[in-house]
Amino acid sequence: MKRPLIIVALAALAALLLPLVLPWGHAQIDWDHVRAGLMEHGHMLGTDDLGRDRLARLLVGTRTTMMVAFAAALVSLVIGTIWGAAAGWIGGRTDEIMMRIVDGLYALPFMFVVILLMVVFGRSILLVFIGIGAVEWLTMARVVRGQVMALKSRPFVLAAEAAGSPGRSTLIRHILPNVAGVAIAYLMLTVPQVVMVESFLSFLGLGVQEPLTSLGILVNEGADEMDMVPAALLLPGGILVTIIICLTLAGEKYRDHLAQQASR
């Protein structure tokens, strides 16, 4: 699990810090050197058809994609944990109604809902991660609900209730800490899914707006230039695939680690 996380951490650090020391901003235009080649005129990866530095845009695009992915995943964690914990703890008719709502939302075309939110409320980076996170919480809610229902009949929970602990306090102090490990595992698996969704939306032009950029936007732009500048597509595409694979591997290894601990 460490190696994939190290790769993602290094990519995140590079995307955060290197734009601060580059001589060109991601939206700054070098009118004198449009379509500059590699290592020409102070541009390590050259410039695009508008004279913008490719390296700066690649770093900022990576930063934007990762920021949206982690923020949206956190939104899904919060919503899913609250909903699932409430349903599992209350139980009965309330639990049935709440989970039927989740089942109904599962039946909706996920991508259509996100695109509809972008069209109705406009495009902004805030709305992107809220919109994606607001529809990615369904699996998290089911996972948390199952864990809460399994834990609330355990002896340490019954002992807390027998000692006079209020229901809300028992849930927060005794059950949720034991659910955290599983929730984090599924959070780590949610992040690469959000990366793919955000990149797809940006590829379609429904993600973040210029002058901000993301890996999806860069892949879209690179596809038009692939014949002349293959690196314009290969670099953002390679970074995107690497991030998705590393995050998926890390999440699966952490989930397997939890499963091994639970079986002991």
Residue ranges of model-derived segments:
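Non-cytoplasmic
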Residues: 115-116, 124-129, 133, 183-217
